């Protein structure tokens, strides 16, 4: 099953599960937990501008945007990753369905609190996400990784994002230069 280019993209369900995790749409009461998770990952900012300091209001706006059912924002979804055993939010991601192409999904961020990294929650989330998106008829997931963010490169490549679609960035290397690659994982 594939989607017609003229049909709106199908969206992830508001709640789904993996063996150890519950993934569900972010809600306003989750914002302070999401902000704490993001802030705990600020150590990555020197390698990846995505992790620069973000005000709490910006995360609240992303949660609100994720709850929109009209306009182009309906394609955007922020979901919290919770441990089944405790119910604690350990990470989150946001994606855009049908972007940048109709049969793809763009992952704009996937982040786990450092206390919950190296427990295979990221792999479990990505494997579950791939299963969900494949069932909805998507063909691929795209994302961007900063080349200075070696832990992220290892994570994404180790999780099947091995096709380089595009290089972005400066042509010469300096301490402040920017470079990133767009990666793809086929779902079929």
Give short role names for the model-derived ranges:
Residues 142-146, 157, 162-180:
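Conserved catalytic-core motifs of GNAT/GCN5-like acyltransferases
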Residues 106, 137-139, 160:
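Short loop/turn motifs at secondary-structure junctions
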Residues 3-21, 25-117, 126-128, 132, ...:
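Acetyl-CoA-dependent GNAT
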Residues 102-104, 140, 180:
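A generic structural signal for beta-strand entry/edge sites
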Residues 88, 113-127, 136, 147-154, ...:
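Conserved glycine-rich acetyl-CoA-binding loop
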């Amino acid at each position: 099953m594939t989607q017609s280019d003229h049909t709106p993209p199908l969206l992830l369900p508001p709640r789904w599960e993996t063996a150890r995790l519950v993934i569900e749409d972010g809600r306003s009461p989750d914002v302070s937990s999401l902000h704490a998770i993001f802030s705990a990952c600020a150590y990555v900012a020197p390698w990846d501008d995505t992790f620069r300091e973000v005000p709490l209001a910006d995360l609240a706006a992303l949660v609100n945007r994720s709850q929109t059912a009209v306009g182009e924002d309906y394609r955007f979804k922020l979901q919290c990753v919770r441990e089944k055993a405790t119910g604690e939010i350990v990470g989150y991601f946001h994606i855009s369905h049908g972007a940048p192409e109709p049969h793809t999904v763009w992952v704009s961020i996937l982040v786990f609190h450092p206390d919950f990294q190296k427990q295979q929650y990221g792999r479990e989330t990505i494997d579950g996400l791939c299963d969900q998106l494949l069932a909805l008829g998507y063909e691929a997931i795209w994302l961007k990784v900063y080349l200075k963010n070696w832990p992220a490169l290892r994570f994404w490549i180790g999780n099947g994002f091995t096709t380089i679609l595009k290089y972005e960035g400066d042509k010469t290397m300096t301490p402040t230069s920017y470079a990133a690659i767009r990666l793809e994982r086929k779902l079929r």
